[in-house]
């Protein structure tokens, strides 16, 4: 641990370029396996099996094999002949990927620390609390009244392996590390089902998520470098915080140096970026770019992005992956929400001397609604209700104690309320709560061989209190006078930074 601290204290502008020797250091694999290095855990001192554990003995064997064979200089034609890892190929390759990902993250970490330290007087956010999904919250809170069109963009795919290596050349100057990456990609994984997937969504092996998240986010960063102009040209682009918003856990700060490069090489196209009302956000494998401009302007954006990505990444990116939609009559599935723009009609009466005028005005409002039909379908699949939304009992849980049954239903209800707290209309959530509450009552009544009416009379209001969500409890304490009628407060949208996805409804089979 002290050795890596000394390494991080070296000249950050030069020494981080030489990362290759770290691949032979044992502590790198320990840090990659357990960054906290909890001293109470003895797993690092064990000699376990090959599948799911780690030991220094296996690390020593791996490093010894790497010292004995200069396998990083082998050509791609001889990859199938290289058997230096022997029978432990799967385990050793996983360990190398974890160690390599940890090492390559060092330059990004140093750049991030340097950029955050430049903000004097500002508190540095803990990186593990910020992810790219959090940029969607201010995007949904933006004022969409002036926007007309939106671009739905699929991030370019598939990607050639060499493109991934070339992308990292801008950050990692160590040629040996790049040779190791190239060798590693060709030797150990068939990425046709991972990074180079022909599907818009990317899936990663659970054993090597850190390594592939690193590669994927590096590639996405290159794709998003085009939009750095927007942040500098527009004061309304509040959706992506390039200074503090981190992409994953450690180091993905948004660097603005690319602006200078683009400003010199693409003077002709800079006028496209002068729209003061552009909104950009990325989620999963898609991006959204909204504008107040005309159809002609947004169409120019479309062809510019297609040509830029084709030239920069040497891939065939056809225009069918970018769709132009008019915001006023288009709805989309967005992070589990059904998002749409609706017109709120209003009438204004104007009095001028003896004449009066009635002026009709329509204000655009961006709604984030709970998709009730898919959500009921998920509940029906998990046997909480029928496909029509009628609550039914959960026979699988009848053997559990009453407290466990209630706790499981309450947890699902609170998870759904927590995730969809940003909905502009909460009525659907209360319907979901009704389904889960009555399903819980039917399950308990089935267990005690009683009717629902009899069980509810015996339990009283305790079951209702259990299903009181944490949001309702907080609002009741904050607004005690309005605890009986919090309809107006519940209509406000609340966003939580610990929201990443909806937990599986059928976790407790």
From Swiss-Prot:
Q: Which GO terms describe its cellular component?
A: chloroplast
PANTHER family named in the record? MATURASE K
Broad class of the protein's primary localization: plastid
Underlying gene: matK
A single Gene Ontology biological process assigned to it is: RNA splicing
Q: Which InterPro entries match?
A: Domain_X, Maturase_MatK, Maturase_MatK_N
Q: Which residues form a coiled coil?
A: none
Protein name stated in the entry = Maturase K
Is the Lipid metabolism keyword given for this protein?
no
Write out the annotated subcellular location. Plastid, Chloroplast
Note one Pfam family from the annotation.
MatK_N
Domain of life of the organism in this record?
Eukaryota
Q: Which GO terms describe its molecular function?
A: RNA binding
**What family is reported?**
Belongs to the intron maturase 2 family. MatK subfamily.
Per its database record, what is this protein's job? Answer: Usually encoded in the trnK tRNA gene intron. Probably assists in splicing its own and other chloroplast group II introns.
Q: Which UniProt keywords apply?
A: Chloroplast, mRNA processing, Plastid, RNA-binding, tRNA processing
